[in-house]
Amino acid sequence: EERRLFYVGMTRAKERLFLTASKVYGEGKRPLKISPFVYESLGKEMVNRQPPRVNQLSLLRFKPIEEEPEAPFIPNRPIDHFSFSQITTFEHCPAQYRYQYLQKIPTAPSGVQNFGISIHQALHQFFKRAQKRGVGLEDLLALYQANWLSFGYTSSHHEKRLFKEGKEMLTRFYQEDFNQDSLPDFLEKKFNFFLTEKIKITGVFDRVDRNDNAWEIIDYKTGKPMDQKQADKSMQMNLYLLAATDRGILGATAEDLTGTFYFLATGQKISVKKTKQELIQAKRNLSKIIEKINQSDFSARPGFWCDFCP
């Protein structure tokens, strides 16, 4: 029976099989012999073979390793399509942009990212259902549970805390903002437009509402609220409003457009209005950043945030 178990154990190896043995186990004082099954498997000569002895060399005799500087990374061709996430990643750290978007090194999403995805998916499916029939809070919370992504969190306590916070966010949203008679015109609306003749921008509107000729682009946020000054300077909202003025997307005028950040944690809404001239300037600013990306060698930008890099 022992021989059979030994054989079964050996046949479970997928790439390599290591057989180890010791002359003494635990507090035993009498030296033990190697199992005869090992001799049967490998042969006596292989088991009794002694490894060649190598005299230890002084570490001082070794030449220090000279690290060769890493060659700058240069894409094969100019990058011609961007999203808001790509642009902000480059602004944060060019090296992270290179790893994530050019070399496409996969990273596992964090718990906070999965939390945001779960909330967005629950709201999206809730409104889709509301377009077909009457819905209640129980529908929204059931969809939240069904869409919950339960990985990436630092601990089970972290996951439970965020799940509870999300439940409170959605309950507040339903009680204070949901109206069955006033549903969005578009949900999770994908868009792409040409910022210049050669540069395409892609993205997704969380929600688009229309009242006569007035359009409101709503972006749900699960994180910390920003103030009006930060919202007015938001590159993300500038990009959304630029997209909304494109004839192939909404074709709205600057005067008829409002961009709103909806902070689900507090129920706070902060809206942004831009003039036609301000959107033209925003377009220039985005073009300059993209020009920097295409001229970059994607060197790292070290800082305290490196400890949190995926």
PLM features: residue spans?
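C-terminal accessory regions
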Residues: 1-46, 59, 89, 290-310
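Hydrophobic (often cysteine-bearing) scaffold residues that line and stabilize catalytic clefts
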Residues: 2-6, 111, 115, 119, ...
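Substrate-binding beta-hairpin/strand module that engages nucleic acids
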Residues: 18-20, 24-34, 135-144, 184, ...
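Short, polar/flexible loop-turn hinges at active-site or ligand-entry regions and domain interfaces
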Residues: 25-27, 105-112, 129-134, 225-227, ...
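C-terminal, charged and often intrinsically disordered regions of DNA end-processing helicases
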Residues: 39-129, 166, 181, 185
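Polybasic (Lys/Arg-rich)
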Residues: 70, 79, 276-308
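A non-catalytic, helix-rich entry segment at domain boundaries
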Residues: 122-195
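Mg2+/Mn2+-dependent nuclease catalytic core
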Residues: 192-283
